[in-house]
Amino acid sequence: MAAIAVAGVGLMVVCSSSLAAAMMMGGEEKEDPIVPKTPVVPVVPTLPSGQYVKLVHTSLTDVINLAELEVFTKAGTTNLATGKTVTSSAFHPAGPLPNLVDGNMTNFAHTMNEIAATGDSMLIDLGSVQEIEKIKITNRVDCCQERAIGIKVIILGADGTTVVKETPAITTNAATYTFTFPGTAWV
């Protein structure tokens, strides 16, 4: 049971933790012999590392139709995807796959939606395992921007199958989408 003592202008609550009471009164903090202090070590989130970046449409009936995909490391200045190999389930001849990583924001890459059982996807091989901090998708400017809704990004390991990180699907219609790890949403 706690007792309350009033002395002068101070009020002291005496209880099982006299250390806390002493601190409230301006006394010096002394290490509790029962619960020693442990240093606080900040937790720094790790960035995903992968060799493949896969765009997947969550709708089994929609196509992927985008102007550009950019992938950046922590330094953030070099686009790792520029000029890399892009493969797909099937592509539309009006939107060749290399357009996705050519640096030109006015052309586009386009899938065909021929494999309804799995939905459309595009796979970019970065050439080696890279630490990835940011992914930027540029939508088409001339039409069909709503087609980006439902696309998510999956970072895969060196074997091309091990999932390292997966973003949520895009839910809004916009000109560009940026995902910065360890984030939780596209902006």
Where are these predicted regions, by residue range?
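A short beta-strand element within beta-rich, extracytoplasmic domains
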Residues: L55, E131-D142
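Single-pass alpha-helical membrane anchors
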Residues: A2-K30
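Disordered, acidic Ser/Thr/Pro-rich linker "stalks" and the adjacent N-terminal cap
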Residues: P42-G50, L60-V129, R140-R147, E166-W186
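Ser/Thr/Pro/Gly-rich low-complexity linker/stalk segments immediately outside membranes or between
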Residues: G26-V44
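Extracellular beta-strand elements of beta-rich domains used
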Residues: L69-V71, I135, V153
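Preference for bulky hydrophobic residues occupying beta-strand positions
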Residues: L55, I124, I137, V153-I155
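Short, surface-exposed beta-strand/strand-loop-strand elements in extracellular ectodomains
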Residues: C144-D159
